[in-house]
Regions:
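Positively charged n-region of N-terminal signal peptides that target proteins for export
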Residues: 1-6
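Bacterial N-terminal signal peptides
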Residues: 7-18
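Compositional signal for N-terminal targeting/processing segments
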Residues: 21-357
């Protein structure tokens, strides 16, 4: 059965993608005669960070108390529908199955699992809405269709909609290039519009990766306006956004070391390591901030190598010096020094590599 479905969807793939690729952005006509009078509260996140999911849960509980019930998520429609079924069940079998399907993604972590469990306990009348393309179409998507088939519900809107979203997922995963990324961004807009139309003028809250929630930004490829940018052009002041992702960098140093730079010893605040698996020749990199080193090193020669704040696990501050040790797969190390002079690029601080000797 699944092979037949996939074959049909693949047959439609070229037509489905060429229209969106040709336009370069989601079809604004999909919004129809927009007369939405509710309020959209959109929050950007870094997936799977406890401090952020805790904040999102607190926000949703506050909105829930005020009467909001509709929570939009960066998930396919069928995943959201499946989770809505789970909210009505006594056990957690459905959540366990969906969570298992998320293995290998940023959603497969205990913080996200706890988030959903808390919603079931504290906000049981929540209605999830998924507006992403068909991720996990061969697992969650197929299981959702089989469930509805077992209930003889092949003609209900949720079943037909799931088939459409599976088609989007196959189109996206068969794209394999920047066009596929732009396609996904545009589909997220159209899917958002679709879901919003289902609830008339109710206020809603949404949680998405921060790459999708900047009302002035392009998508990750720079090809099309990102989701929130496009939604802003449709819903105007009805759309409110806030980026929660900086909370992920609001961390304390793990320990204090001593690092010598330009013949001077400095207190070095260590913030941990980042895995570089997948980068040729490198295993991981580690980060320090040198306390009080800026004045001594501000006139050091610059190499022209820039590193934005998004590369750091902690907040980057202006007028500071940072040390990054790169460890290669052969266990050799390379130490680089970066200085922050308050320069901004794409709304974030950037650091520049300096020569300390």
């Amino acid at each position: 059965m699944m092979k037949i479905r996939i074959a049909i969807v693949l047959f439609l793939y070229c037509a489905a993608t060429s229209v969106v690729y040709a336009h370069g952005k989601a079809d604004a006509d999909a919004a129809g005669n927009n007369n939405y009078t509710g309020t959209i509260y959109l929050y950007g996140e870094q997936h799977g960070v406890k401090k952020i999911t805790d904040k999102e849960l607190a926000l949703w509980r506050a909105y829930y108390t005020k009467g909001l019930r509709h929570l939009f998520l960066e998930l396919p429609s069928y995943t959201a529908e499946y989770l809505n079924m789970w909210l009505r069940e006594k056990d957690n079998t459905i959540l366990e199955e969906v969570f298992n399907d998320w293995k290998g993604t940023a959603f497969h972590n205990q913080h996200t699992y706890h988030f959903f469990m808390q919603i079931k306990e504290l906000c049981p009348q929540t209605v999830f809405h998924g507006t992403d393309v068909g991720h996990q179409y061969g697992t969650t998507g197929e299981r959702f269709l089989r469930y509805l088939e077992s209930k003889q519900q092949q003609n209900i809107p949720a079943y037909l909609r799931a088939q459409e979203i599976i088609q989007q997922g196959i189109a996206y995963y068969n794209g394999g290039n920047a066009k596929a990324m732009a396609y996904r961004e545009n589909m997220m807009v159209q899917n958002f519009i679709y879901e919003l139309k289902q609830i008339q003028n109710d206020n809603i809250m949404g949680i998405y990766g921060s790459a999708h929630t900047d009302t002035a930004a392009l998508d990750s490829t720079g090809a099309v306006p990102c989701m929130a940018n496009q939604l802003k052009s449709i819903y105007g002041n009805n759309l409110n956004t806030e980026d929660l992702s900086p909370l992920a960098k609001d961390i304390e140093p793990i320990r204090i070391d001593t690092i010598t730079a330009a013949h001077t010893d400095y207190r070095a605040y260590y913030y941990g390591k980042q895995d570089l698996t997948g980068f040729k020749d490198f295993a991981y990199r580690e980060f320090w901030q040198l306390d009080g080193a800026y004045q001594a090193l501000k006139n050091s020669g610059k190499t022209g190598d820039w590193l934005p704040e998004s590369n750091y696990p902690m907040k980057v501050e202006a007028y500071q010096v940072y040390v990054i040790d790169y460890t290669k797969i052969d266990n050799t190390k390379m130490r680089l020094y970066y200085i922050s002079e308050g320069k901004m690029q794409n709304r974030q601080l950037i650091t520049e590599n300096i020569a300390t000797e």
